[in-house]
Each structure stands twice: as structure tokens, then as C-alpha cells.
Amino acid sequence: AVLQHMLYLQEQGFEVTFLPVDETGLISLEDLKEALREDTILVSIMYVNNEVGAREPVEEAAELVHRLAPKAWFHTDAIQAYGKYQIRPKKAGIDLLSVSGHKIHGPKGSGFLYINEKVKIHPLILGGGQQKGMRSGTDNVPGIAGLGAAAADCYKDFEEKQKKLRALRNYFIEEVEKLPDIQVNGPKEEEKAAPQIVSVSFRGVRSEVLLHALEERGIYVSSGSACSSNKKLPVSAVLKEIHLESDLLDSTLRFSFCNEEELDYCLENLKELLPVLRKYARH
């Protein structure tokens, strides 16, 4: 979503700088520092990458932006981070923050944009002036109510939920790394990795084939982001950017999880399916 808008702005004559990432999906603050200019007006950095789970240094980046480019507003796509981290936008120096309801068990199609009161935004939709003039059109009251309830609920027992997610992630990585010819992608350090996402490459098996084989057994995983699911792209742009080996680009799946029983069921099926699928892939 952010990338397409940046490409659009580039077409309109704006100068846009795209920062590289390392092999775990993280940006370098030094690269950001070098890219900032006095006339920079907007910086957007993903809080958590939705494919490999890299948690970007958002607070440090925001501090750099406000210090070195005082005219710039700082935006973060927090769709994979909201509910998983305690985000305080003003304290973190975040001017704009995007959230999507379905990631916190809210109604699909709902979401919100946090806007610092200092930021003045022109509406894209004109009309009746609903939502304080920011988005005209009849309010989706059930969606708003559901999103509000989900937002209130997702931070209840936060520490306990975090501990559970971290334990599940660590357990899954420990077990999946016992399988032959696999590679776990993204940061290894807990503080740099989201607790709910694990990216795994399975050498010798196409991701689409493994995805459907798991699907037939009631296990639902992803081979890319929802943002790119409607685009006929040969491989994920994210996986290319982290310089994944060419033979792994089309052999990578993203896992999220709920409980240990589901993980055990998934791991059992991976152990059973991988040798069979690799055998057929060689023929």
C-alpha cells in the first residue's frame, strides 16, 4: 500500500528515496541518516514487516527524522504491530500511524489512521464531511464499533499474551529447524523480530504446492503478503530485497499461530509431506 503511493508520487515529480534492508529485513539507521535532506517532507517505515517479521527501529528512526529533517512528517504502517507492541505515538515521535482491524480480530475492512494534531491532511473524499471532514460518506457504524471493541480487547492481559506468543514462536523455530533443507528467515534476536510471524524456506518444494498440501489438511499458511495476493508477481519483492537464494524465492511460507497443539499438528504434517513433495519435484 505504501510502496504504490510512493511510486505514484514519484510519477508526479516528487523525489523518492527507497532504503535497502539487510538479509533479515531491517533498515540501517545510517542509510536513513544519509537519505534525509532539509527538504524531506515525509518518511514512511513499516513497524513490522508482514512477511519475515522484522521489527524496524521505528522510535530511533522517528528521532532521526525530526532532528535532521524538521519539515518532515513520520508515518509508520503498524498493521502487523498494533496489539503486539505497546505503541505510544507521541512518545515515539510518530506523526501518522496506520492500523487494520482484521489483524486484531476486528471487522474485516475496518481500520484507522492516527494523525498527530499538528499534521494537516487534505481529505481524498469530499461530501458530507463525516469523520471530522477527513472521509466523507455514511459512517460504517458496525465496523467502527467492532474495531473499537477489538482495539480495547487486544491489550487486555498484554504481558501474558506476549509471553505466550514468544514461547510459541521459539518452540516452532526450534522444531522446524530440525527438518532437513529448511531456512528460517528474518531476525533471530527477539527484540528485532515480531512474536507472531515466522518465515520459513523449504528447499526443493514450491511454496504454492506445499501451501495447498497443508491446506488440504486444514492448515492455512501464506506464501506472501495480502497486499500482493492479487498481483501476478513471480516472487515476493520482500524476499528479493533480503537477497534470499534464488532457489528459495519460490519455496517460502509465512506461519502465524494460536496454540501449541496447532503447531504440533503443523509440524507433524510438514515432516510427512516434505519428503513426498521433494520426491515428486525431482521427477
Where are these regions (language model features)?
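Pyridoxal 5′-phosphate
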Residues: 1-283
